[in-house]
A protein has these predicted regions:
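N-terminal binding-site loop/beta-alpha segment at the start of enzyme catalytic domains
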Residues: 1, 29, 57
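Active-site mouth loops of central-metabolism enzymes
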Residues: 1-16, 37-43
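Active-site groove signature of glycoside hydrolases
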Residues: 23-43
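Beta/alpha (TIM)-barrel catalytic core signal, keyed to glycine-rich beta->alpha loops juxtaposed to Asp/Glu
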Residues: 43-184
Length: 184
């Protein structure tokens, strides 16, 4: 999606316009889950949740999902969606052996308390938890072409040592590093 005239955060205009554009591109009438992908510091939470509610009420989405929220904001968003009688069912968050943010920002505990599901993205830490980085950064690594999510500066000798130590544990368990990371 492009930023458009309303940014790419959580405004009502942006969310509903992006949903319409996505449905048109996919040739669909609705999506099962319409996610809002990150907390917006510039848009009232009520506006964002109201837009998600409108997407459900208009039949363009069956359920609402949130992504990259912290625990306290998740609690507020859930209360708003409950008040609007909108089915909010799932959180999508980055979570891996290397990224345990949701344990520290209250999201994991709050989701459990509210009986909301969590689905992870990047459980292999952008490929770090595979055999690709055991010897360092491969020549064809995405850090050389698209460093938005995986940055060369973050793949330090210490990180490579951690990857190799985890790989040793995985091998001792009869697993690949990726298998162990996913099982974790």
């Amino acid at each position: 999606m492009w930023d458009g005239p309303y940014g790419n955060w959580g405004s009502r205009k942006y969310l509903l316009a992006s949903l319409d554009q996505s449905l048109r591109r996919m040739g669909l009438d609705y999506v099962d889950i319409f996610y809002h992908h990150r907390m917006d510091p510039n848009t009232p939470l009520e506006e964002t949740m109201g837009a998600l509610a409108q997407a459900v009420r208009s039949g363009k989405a069956l359920y609402v999902g949130l992504s990259n929220y912290d625990g306290p904001t998740l609690e507020k968003a859930t209360a708003i969606l409950d008040e609007l009688h909108v089915p909010f069912i799932i959180n999508q968050n980055r979570y891996s052996i290397f990224d345990r943010t949701i344990e520290n920002n209250g999201l994991k505990a709050m989701a459990a308390r509210l009986h909301k599901g969590i689905i992870t993205f990047s459980p292999l830490a952008q490929g770090l938890l595979t055999n690709r980085y055991l010897q360092g950064i491969p020549a064809d690594s995405r850090v050389h072409t698209d460093g938005r999510f995986l940055k060369e500066k973050d793949i330090t000798p210490e990180k490579i040592a951690q990857i190799n130590a985890l790989n040793d544990i995985a091998q001792a368990r009869g697993q690949t590093l990726a298998e162990m990371a996913l099982a974790w």
